[in-house]
């Protein structure tokens, strides 16, 4: 083997590693789905109409408190995963659109959505976390209801409305850049409309479906490796 060819080997290895890494970065979209679902199932607060005693009981005991804390942790991780995925997709769009400048609105709205989801998780976990560490007793039922409702408002309303705008913008940009096909573009636009009703909770499934589909498409695309 010539010395020139040998000298090129480190360069080839360095070039291959980023490509291999880039292939798997879209998994952050699927990670959001995993963390979000885990956050939902980790704890089960009572309904708003449940008795005061049931609310206090739901936050009493090591097992219950750990569950609520895990909900907060998983939602924080979900928020980080969402903004990571959007960054990956937007970067792919920006590279494919050169020399045109791509509007960074999806990055801004993804940051807002991630912050709201994480803040909602903190609100949901705060009471249980304080009690679990022994720094305070279990709060009264009214405060427990407030923290749970406030957490859902941040996640299911503020966070999902920002996510709806993000998905709509990304879908249009990815279609224009040739990254998304017609079907995935339509799925993204439909998901963004459905998310407007996210206060009903079930419509949030539309975001999960879109993230899985978009992640698979990005992993299969040539730019992914």
Regions found by a protein language model. Give the residues of each.
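Hydrophobic, aromatic-enriched alpha-helical segments typical of multi-pass transmembrane helices
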Residues: 2-225
């Amino acid at each position: 083997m010539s010395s020139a060819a040998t000298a090129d080997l480190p360069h080839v290895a360095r070039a291959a590693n980023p490509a291999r890494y880039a292939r798997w970065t879209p998994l952050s979209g699927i990670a959001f789905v995993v963390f979000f679902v885990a956050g939902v199932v980790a704890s089960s607060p009572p309904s708003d109409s449940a008795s005061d005693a049931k609310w206090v009981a739901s936050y009493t005991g090591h097992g219950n408190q750990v569950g609520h804390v895990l909900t907060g942790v998983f939602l924080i991780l979900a928020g980080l995963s969402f903004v990571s995925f959007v960054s990956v997709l937007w970067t792919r769009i920006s590279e494919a659109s050169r020399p045109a400048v791509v509007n960074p609105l999806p990055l801004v709205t993804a940051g807002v959505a991630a912050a709201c989801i994480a803040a909602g998780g903190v609100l949901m976990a705060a009471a249980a976390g304080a009690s679990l560490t022994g720094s305070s007793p279990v709060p009264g039922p009214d405060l427990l209801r407030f923290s749970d409702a406030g957490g859902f408002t941040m996640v299911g309303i503020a966070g999902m409305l920002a996510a709806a705008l993000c998905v709509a913008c990304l879908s249009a940009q990815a279609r224009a850049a040739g990254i998304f096909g017609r079907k995935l573009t339509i799925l993204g636009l439909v998901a963004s409309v459905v998310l407007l009703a996210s206060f009903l909770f079930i419509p949030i499934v539309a975001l999960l479906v879109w993230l899985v589909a978009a992640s698979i498409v990005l992993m299969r695309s040539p730019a992914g490796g």
